[in-house]
């Protein structure tokens, strides 16, 4: 898959860095993957772009904000790298951003989450195509999952809309709640493939990679740098909600 190319510079983006705020993981590949993703966002936006983490992975938001302030930034946009409006998006992110702003003196603006909109449907379809998954294959859309029913419902709705685009069955499954990947795979007709709703490697993804290998099911990679245009879009939308002058 090709990497993002620089877009014509939007006058709103001048001197306003972007921070991608992810949950974090003990998986050793997370930091490098998110740094690569944010580098791609920086290429699109033409501004400094950094990854920060809520937990388990360094650096945290306060550290990244302090570094940007030391480099002369006065404000930054924080894009939560989350697909659903669950606990992390509604509680953790606002609290972390408030603490980071107070500690660094940086004006931090929270952008919309990545969500499960039509641009995410298009991204998933593109990822499936790039992974060589045939259009007629049914898909397991694998997400982290949440204790919040509405968040899981949003992923089920995303799967339903992806099914319309593909004209082949798509079912959602989760790493932390029902239905499990195996339960969904048992319901899907063959041929079947697995499509992770993950930006990077993760401990919750590793067992599904093993299931795919043992069962002979193709599995697409994490979304990675292909998600950069969506993050860039959330960044630009956030900037357009405030007066930067």
Residue ranges and their predicted role:
Residues 1-245:
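Active-site-proximal alpha-helix that buttresses catalytic centers in soluble enzyme cores
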